[in-house]
Each structure stands twice: as structure tokens, then as C-alpha cells.
Amino acid sequence: MGGRMWLPFPVLLLSALPAALLRGAAGFTPSLDSDFTFTLPAGRKECFYQPMPLKASLEIEYQVLDGGELDIDFHLTSPEGRTLVFEQRKSDGVHTIETEDGDYMFCFDNTFSTISEKVIFFELILDNMGEEVQGQEDWKKYITNTDVLEMKLEDILESINSIKSRLSKSGHIQTLLRAFEARDRNIQESNFDRVNFWSVVNLMVMVVVSAIQVYTLKSLFEDKRKSRT
């Protein structure tokens, strides 16, 4: 075929656009996702800070993957120091808030535990971070024709935003499923160790009881009378 490589139509159309216009594509989706897993020792409290703009969306989801009774205290505080969320002895939680301008603080508190450390997973989803409007304006500056193969650039932008939004949602779901899988695996391993421990204990008890029963029965049939000479 002469070494030609055919691209899907949206990619082919984007490849013909100016380079500066393609740089504006970085502003398609103003959504930022990040997840972390850390170990919180017994008797300790760990806090994190997240700067947020005005009227954005902050979603926090957390799970206790391993340790003790899989429980933790969770606190979410506004930039003014006002308590937004206060949960005690929870294994998981999801919270979404509309933000003010400033630094939000969220803490995981394990001070109630004196023995068990906790493995904690949490994910942050930041929406409406103020980049979408600027990204769309960058596109519109380079629109010179009202029609490109009967498809408007706004339609392409909407399609790309929809695809990226769905991909982001799929990645979010996969991250949560991995966290659930890790927690379930830890629970199964803990149950496995407990079953093995108590099985060994029961086996030892059965052996000791059997030995006592054999000794008792044997002593009942022994002739303890001394023979006279």
C-alpha cells in the first residue's frame, strides 16, 4: 500500500491542526486523580494537606487494608479550621465536598490502638480545577472555518472529553478494586493463620487427652497386689 498508515478519523484530523492548538489539548479534562498507600504505626496520627481553588470538587475515599480490626479515625478540616468530617473506628469512607480557596487537612488517627499498626489506602479526585475554560478558549482561538468535514471542533472536543472522562472513571474503579482485593487478601491470610494456629492447639490437646486416657485405662487393669513368697 506504499507504506501508508491510516489513522482513525479524530486522530487524523488532530494531526492536521496547528501545534499550538495541540498544546491546548492538555487542558481537556480538569480532573486530577492520585492514590497513596502507607503504614500508620500504633499510637500515631498522620495528616495530609491539599491546596484547592474556589468552587472546585474534592473527593476523598479511604480504606483500611490491614491491621487490627481494620478501623481508623478520620478527620477532614476546612482551610478555616472547621471540622467537615469526623469519623471514628471506620474501615472505609467516601466524602465529596465543594471547596473554598485554601489548604484542606485530612488526618488518619491510630492513637486509640496501642499494638496494631494499620495499612491505609486513600484516593483523591480533584475536579473543576479551573483549567477547562482556558483549554476550550485555546481551541477556539484557532478555529478559522465553521466546518471541517462537516464536523465542528467543539464536537471533537466533547467526544475527547467524554472518552477521557470514561477512561478516568475506569481507572478509578480499577484502583478501588485493587484496594478491595488487597484488603480481602489480607483478611484471608489472617484467617488462614488463625485456622492453622487453633488447629495445632486442638491437635496438641487431643494428643494430651488421648495419652491421659490411655494411662488411666492402663492403670485400671494393673494388678497392684504384691505376690507373697
Curated annotation (Swiss-Prot):
Disulfide bonds: none annotated. GO terms for biological process: Golgi ribbon formation; protein transport. Pfam families: EMP24_GP25L. The chain crosses the membrane at residues 197-217. It is a single-pass type I membrane protein. Keywords: Endoplasmic reticulum, Golgi apparatus, Membrane, Protein transport, Signal, Transmembrane, Transmembrane helix, Transport. GO terms for cellular component: cis-Golgi network; endoplasmic reticulum exit site; endoplasmic reticulum membrane; endoplasmic reticulum-Golgi intermediate compartment; endoplasmic reticulum-Golgi intermediate compartment membrane. Residues 1-27 form the signal peptide. It is found in: Endoplasmic reticulum membrane; Golgi apparatus, cis-Golgi network membrane; Endoplasmic reticulum-Golgi intermediate compartment membrane. SMART domains: EMP24_GP25L (SM01190). Residues 218-229 are cytoplasmic. Residues 28-196 are lumenal. Its main location: endoplasmic reticulum. Residues 45-126 form the GOLD domain. SUPFAM superfamilies: Supernatant protein factor (SPF), C-terminal domain. InterPro entries: Emp24-like, GOLD_dom, GOLD_dom_sf. Interacts with TMED9 and TMED10. Belongs to the EMP24/GP25L family. Potential role in vesicular protein trafficking, mainly in the early secretory pathway. Required for the maintenance of the Golgi apparatus; involved in protein exchange between Golgi stacks during assembly. Probably not required for COPI-vesicle-mediated retrograde transport. This is Transmembrane emp24 domain-containing protein 5. The gene is Tmed5.
